[in-house]
From Swiss-Prot:
This is Co-chaperonin GroES. The keyword 4Fe-4S does not apply. Heptamer of 7 subunits arranged in a ring. Interacts with the chaperonin GroEL. Belongs to the GroES chaperonin family. GO terms for cellular component: cytoplasm. GO terms for biological process: chaperone cofactor-dependent protein refolding. One of its GO terms (molecular function) is unfolded protein binding. Together with the chaperonin GroEL, plays an essential role in assisting protein folding. The GroEL-GroES system forms a nano-cage that allows encapsulation of the non-native substrate proteins and provides a physical environment optimized to promote and accelerate protein folding. GroES binds to the apical surface of the GroEL ring, thereby capping the opening of the GroEL channel. PANTHER family: 10 KDA HEAT SHOCK PROTEIN (PTHR10772), CO-CHAPERONIN GROES (PTHR10772:SF58). Pfam families: Cpn10.
Length: 96
């Protein structure tokens, strides 16, 4: 199934964090926090301003982004756990 977000929404796939610390300690699932980093999988066309013009989003498909701990709505699409959030929930793009 193809999913196209509307307006200024984006679809993000979480990037899983390491299961081991640098010292070699394995972190159990119960102690892990959900990662706050992800990859943009789909973007909407942008938000409309008062004149009805569409303002394109600053992020694009493939960007690695950081977002807040409670940002977005969790959904499952084609068996993948994804987040749908507004562009304003994204704190920044991680430089490659």
């Amino acid at each position: 199934m193809k999913f196209r977000p509307l307006h200024d929404r984006v679809v993000v796939r979480r990037i899983e964090s390491e299961e081991k610390t640098k010292g070699g300690i394995i972190i159990p699932d119960t102690a892990k926090e959900k990662p706050q980093e992800g990859e943009i999988v789909a973007v909407g066309p942008g938000a409309r301003d008062e004149q009805g013009r569409v303002n394109a989003l600053d992020v694009k498909v493939g960007d690695r982004v950081l977002f807040g701990k409670w940002s977005g709505t969790e959904v499952k699409i084609d068996g993948q756990d994804l987040l749908i959030m507004k562009e304003s929930d994204i704190m920044g793009v991680v430089a490659a």
